Structure formats: structure tokens, C-alpha cells
Regions:
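Conserved nucleotide-sugar phosphate-binding/catalytic loop shared by glycosyltransferases and other
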Residues: 5, 25-75, 316-318
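C-terminal alpha-helical cap of glycosyltransferases
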Residues: 350-371
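Acidic donor-binding loop of glycosyltransferase active sites
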Residues: 94-96, 261-275
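Donor-nucleotide binding loops and adjacent catalytic segments primarily
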Residues: 35-41, 174, 180-266, 300-303, ...
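Conserved donor-nucleotide binding/catalytic region of nucleotide-linked donor-dependent transferases
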Residues: 313, 318-350, 368-370
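Glycosyltransferases and closely related glycan-assembly transferases
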Residues: 84-98, 104-120, 133-137
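Active-site-proximal region of nucleotide-activated glycan assembly enzymes
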Residues: 25, 54, 113-174
Length: 371
């Protein structure tokens, strides 16, 4: 059986890829480059290259909920995306398509259904992503991570599977090479691509942070902003004591993320649902900085969900300053004992078996279609 996996969200896709049983092989369709017009390879391309999984790069436009200056140029790319999807699927000849959200999944899912290929999609958010809303009428089954998502999809299609990304992160967690230092450790992550806004805020208060804390900072590798290079120069300009306290990295291996979070007194992060769920399961305090441009304010809702569990605070990057950021970080670390998950629920434990549930769904749909 051959599965075409569409990114989207990389971490849950990887979790399923790495647990496929014998007799199943997979290809991956996604973005080769991190940002449009950038030359840096995307994390999904690097991950597939490292695992020797065939990768197909698809160029298409984004379907947007609101009209922006990018709407028309983006729409003009859609026909190309559908044509590429048709050519790819004719070459790949998959038995099943498994989509993990994201705009790349739209043309592949629709064209695949037109070609008679069964489609399964996975929704990892608390509500529903725009791409999956579009694909839902075409999908044979819809795997959801949260009970709150079920009401957005037809009851005969929705299957509660949990989030495979989280289960995989804990399963593959390994001790990180960083040893515990004398000072409390602050871990700063900006998502798989990094965050220029977070990087700039941290840069503005870096020396104040390093006077009190060890800092592990994941910047991403954008060639447009070159944050890693600039911050590396700043690190080299610091005195030897502060320089030693600052660990700079472009990426954090997904296999390391649980142990990295465990080593932290506090995490500063975007509010992606995988990160939020992982932090909840670890009972780890965090200052979350929602991406203001996320669809349907998805990250803000994730951040509010996290704060309701009494594990963190929310920082607004559009009005926040480096000085304000430092003040909140400092206060949270000093009051860390006041942050603990007081609303632990059984729902969080459903993620543990999600990989197998999704694979079982894929096998069920493939067999049903072939009959």
C-alpha cells in the first residue's frame, strides 16, 4: 500500500510516517523552501531528505479568509497547484492520501478525490483549520485531536484519534546534550520556522536575561532576516561569562524537544497546538506569544486554552516591548511554583495511542475502497 502524505503540519505527519507497518510505503508532498522567495530549505524537506522519503515539491496559492494585497497573486497560483497535483498523483499512484492541514493539501486532496483516491485528513487544532474545512466534503474520514473539533465535521466522518505528534514526541524523547547549569534555564522557541518577531524581542533584552538566566534560543534559519547570524555576532560580542550562558541554534530536533522543555524553568514560545499540548502534559510553565496572523486567531485561542490550565501567561507581540518581555519572564520564573496544571483531564491522555488509531483508519478506508 502506498500513502501520499501532505504537509501541512510536519510533526504529526512524521509520527505516522515513522510507525507505518511493513507493506506500507509513503511519499511526502509539501514545500521545499521555508518561505516563499527564500532559499532556506523547509524543515519538512530536510526531515524527508534525512529519512530518505521521496519528496514532491508543490507550488500553489493560499486560499485566504480575508482579502489582502496578496490575495489575487495567490489565487493566480492555484491553477498551477492543481495541475502539479494532477501530474504528481499520476506519477505516485497512491492508494490513500493522508493530509495534515496546510494550503498545500487543498489541491492534492481535491484532485486525488477526482481521481478516485480515498482521502483522510487530520485536524490537530481545537477547532478546525481552513484547509481542512475545504477538504472535509471530499474526505472519507476526518481524524480529530480534540472532542471540541468533532462538532465541526459530519458525525459519520469524524474519528477521535488524538494528536500523533505529541505521542511521538514523548515516545522518542531522549536526554538532551545540555547539562543542568547553576542558573535557571530559559528556553525560547519560535516554531519550526523560527520567529523574527520573537527573535527581535529577545535581542532587545538579551543581556538583561543573561545576567540572571541561561538561555537556549531557537531562531530558525530565514535568509530574509538572518536572525541567527545577527544574534551569533551579538553573542560573540558579549563578555565570556554571558557568552557561555547563551546557546543559539537554528533548529531543535523534534526528538529533543521534550527533554529540552523539561530542562527549562520557563519556555517562551509560539502557541502552536503541538507545543501547547506538550507543555500541558509536561506541566511546564510558559509565556506564550500567539502568532497574530494565524487563521481564525487559532494561536490566540490555543494560548487562552493553555492559560485556563493555569500554566502560563500570554504576551502580545504587537504592543509588547523587550523591556516588558523581560519583566514578565523574570516575574514568572520567580513565581514558578504558582504555575501548575489544575485542570488535568482524561482528554490529554487520548493522544498516547493516536498514531495507531490513524494508521488503523488509513487501513480501514483503503480496504473499504478496494472492495
Amino acid at each position: 500500500m502506498r500513502i501520499a502524505i501532505i504537509g501541512g503540519h510536519l510533526t504529526p505527519a512524521l509520527a505516522v510516517l515513522e510507525h507505518l507497518p511493513k507493506g506500507m510505503d509513503a511519499v511526502y508532498i509539501g514545500r521545499k523552501f521555508a518561505l516563499e522567495g527564500d532559499t532556506a530549505y523547509s524543515l519538512e524537506y530536510q526531515a524527508m531528505h534525512d529519512r530518505r522519503i521521496p519528496f514532491f515539491h508543490l507550488t500553489t496559492g493560499r486560499l485566504q479568509r480575508t482579502f489582502t494585497p496578496q490575495t489575487i497573486p495567490s489565487l493566480l497560483k492555484l491553477p498551477r497547484g492543481f495541475w502539479q497535483a494532477f501530474r504528481m498523483l499520476q506519477t505516485i499512484k497512491p492508494d490513500v492520501i493522508l493530509g495534515f492541514g496546510g494550503y498545500v493539501s487543498v489541491p492534492v486532496g481535491i484532485v486525488g478525490k477526482m481521481l478516485g483516491i480515498p482521502l483522510i485528513i487530520h485536524e490537530q487544532t481545537l477547532e478546525t483549520g481552513f484547509a481542512n474545512q475545504i477538504l472535509a466534503p471530499f474526505a472519507d474520514k476526518i481524524c480529530v485531536s480534540w472532542k471540541s473539533s468533532q462538532k465541526f465535521f459530519p458525525a459519520n466522518k469524524a474519528v477521535l484519534t488524538g494528536n500523533p505528534a505529541v505521542a511521538s514526541l514523548f515516545e522518542k524523547s531522549k536526554p538532551h546534550r545540555l547539562t543542568k547549569g547553576v542558573l535557571p534555564r530559559l528556553v525560547i522557541v519560535g516554531g519550526s520556522l523560527g520567529s523574527h518577531a520573537i527573535n527581535a524581542l529577545i535581542e532587545g533584552c538579551l543581556e538583561d536575561l543573561l545576567k540572571q538566566y541561561e538561555v537556549l534560543h531557537q531562531t530558525g534559519d530565514s535568509k530574509e532576516f538572518r536572525d541567527f547570524d545577527r544574534l551569533a555576532q551579538k553573542r560573540d560580542s558579549l563578555g565570556p561569562i554571558l557568552r557561555e550562558r547563551y546557546t543559539l541554534t537554528k533548529f531543535i530536533d523534534p526528538d529533543d524537544i521534550v527533554s529540552v522543555f523539561e530542562s527549562a524553568e520557563l519556555v517562551v514560545t509560539r502557541a502552536g497546538i503541538n507545543t501547547i499540548t506538550t507543555l500541558l502534559l509536561l506541566n511546564k510553565p510558559a509565556l506564550v506569544i500567539p502568532l497574530p496572523t494565524s487563521q481564525k486567531n487559532e494561536q490566540l485561542k490555543n494560548a487562552q486554552f493553555f492559560k485556563q490550565h493555569n500554566l502560563g501567561e500570554i504576551f502580545n507581540q504587537t504592543i509588547g516591548t523587550p523591556e516588558k518581555l523581560f519583566t514578565i519572564i523574570d516575574a514568572m520564573i520567580k513565581q514558578k511554583n504558582s504555575y501548575t496544571n489544575t485542570h488535568a483531564t482524561e482528554e490529554l491522555t487520548t493522544h498516547k495511542h493516536s498514531v495507531q488509531k490513524i494508521i488503523d483508519t488509513v487501513i480501514y478506508v483503503a480496504k473499504k475502497t478496494s472492495q
